[in-house]
Every structure is written in C-alpha cells, then in structure tokens.
C-alpha cells in the first residue's frame, strides 16, 4: 500500500524505518548539478517489469493504489479503477485506461534525481529508481503536472498529505544516496518538524535492476 496521510504532529505511518525528520537531517547537501545529458531514456524503458511478475510497473502501481479495479485480458492490464482520495488534491478520480486523468508520479522526479547524483550511476541503478514502488504513487494528473520535476523546496501537496509526501521523498533519497540542495533540505526539515514522529517509509525493490534491462 502507498503511504497514508497523517495529521500534523501525530505518530505518522510507515514500516519501521525510524523518524523521517532524523533521516532528512542526515541527507548530504550539495549544489544541483547541470541537467546536461538527462533524458527519460537514461532510466530505461518506461515501466519495465523489474520485479519479474509479468506485469509492467505502471499496472502494478495502479493495482496497489486504486479501488474497484477491473482488468483487460487477465490480471495485469488495469482497465478501470477509482482513486478514492487523490493524495495531491483530496478528490476522487476515476481511472479509465487510455484517458489522462490519472498519473503515476515519481515522488523524486527522475530529472531531479539526475541532477543530484543519478547522472553518475550505472544504468541498473537508474532503472531500479524509475521502477521502485517506494518512489511511485498514483495521483490525479492535473496537480501532478503542476508539480513537474520540482523538489520539496519548490512544490509540496496540500497539508493533509504533506508530511507523508516529504517523508517518502526523504526515504527514496536516503535509500539511493541522492543528495539534496540546502533549500530542499531546509524545506524538508520545516515540514517534518510539524510531524516529528512521522515514520520513514521502507521497502520497495532492490537498488539494482536485473541485468536483462538496459538504458541508453
């Protein structure tokens, strides 16, 4: 299941990874590297089946996050589902395959990751990040487009989901060894200081994809 929203100042949710605030304070601070050389293809083909369950990553996340799910041809291709409460708007959003009302968001945007360490990785690690369920969330398309590739210093969701969202970004950056800018770290600490017991999410896939996957 994806991280759940928690009220500011409560105990938070998570999988036992410790306090998100403590983890945020431990992240390495560096300047943003140039975006030169970035392309989506550097992170492999979109939605690769890196967990080898015969379903692509996008459908895996839709199945995880939507309710009332219906499939086309078996139990992989999600044709319909309901996002009961969009983390980025609080609204109910209906997913229909081929429509554009729902996105799968990379919590840590791939271009942001590229500028904060991923440009120096091998392809296996970049592919893993792009398909790690820890870094993926089903959201409404409209608010996600407003986020773009912003980090915590430039975009956060409404207050009801803010602590959970920032904790998830911290978890991904810590897991993969990505750095943060000084403004980004300050923003993370500011948010998580309002919910200092917010747990750090854990889990997801290994940080290297199987050798059969390749990226440009």
Where in the sequence are the language-model features?
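N-terminal low-complexity, Pro/Thr-rich disordered segments
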Residues: 1-33, 190, 194-216
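Domain-level detector of nuclease and nuclease-like folds
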Residues: 87-216
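Cell wall/extracellular polymer interaction/catalysis modules
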Residues: 9-87, 91, 98
